Amino acid sequence: LGSGYQLEMYVHPGAGAYICGEETALIESNEGHRGMPRLKPPFPAQEGLFGGPTVVNNVETLCCVPHIINRGADWFLSLGCEKNGGTKLYGVSGRVRRPGLYELPMGTSLFDIVFHHAGGLAPGRKLKGVIPGGSSTPVLLPEEINVPMDFDSLARVGSMLGSGAVIVMDDTVCMVRVAARLARFYAHESCGQCTPCREGVPWMAAILSRLEEGGGRADDPELLMELCDNIQGNTICPLGEACAMPVRALVQKYRSEFERHVREGKCPFGPVPPPWNEV
């Protein structure tokens, strides 16, 4: 490229384990070990791959670097909001007309992403909730989605930007089923290193599955909250919390739906509805 600087680049494919999204588990995997997070410190910038200082960044972050170098930091910051500059990739899925990947300025409101860029809901449907930043981020109610999609604003409403993966749910969606699917995913992806995550997340998944199938107990919502309390803050990496935080929010915000499953002994929403979107 005419820079006078040369380097060797290797593209090393992974096996798809979710836990390897954690930086030190990724390093362990690249070293040929099982993908399990390390205790920190030391942080990768001090002691990372094969003991050397290592920078670990997402591809999305690295893709911004050439534009910042070519056009300057001020230009990049001008694209977003005051404390969160640049653009962000928002992947919108769920019950919307136009699911897809949208690159938008940081600070674009969640309402605009769902109803303007992704086209809103199917005719006659009502919004029930939106997960703003991927499966690990707490759900937001319809009255909360006027929030700007940036790190600080979402933190103020009790959620996170995360990966920017927006999941939209309308009034056909069973929130107990949502919680059960999330918990089953995290139970499968746990590396098993930490007891609260290894034991607590599958237990949570089992409780949610029996609620979904009509075998729930009256104290299951409280038991789920207790499990969340015991998982959060007690693991080496955030994977256990990534399950506990969204489940806690779903139980808190849709408590009556969980109780209805217990009371009626079945899922009142019936089978999973087919996907709907405009092609």
Model-derived regions: residue spans:
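Ferredoxin-type iron-sulfur electron-transfer modules in oxidoreductases and energy-metabolism complexes
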Residues: 1-3, 148-279
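Short, conserved aromatic-histidine micro-motifs
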Residues: 40-67, 126, 131, 135, ...
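Hydrophobic alpha-helical positions that pack around
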Residues: 1-106, 118
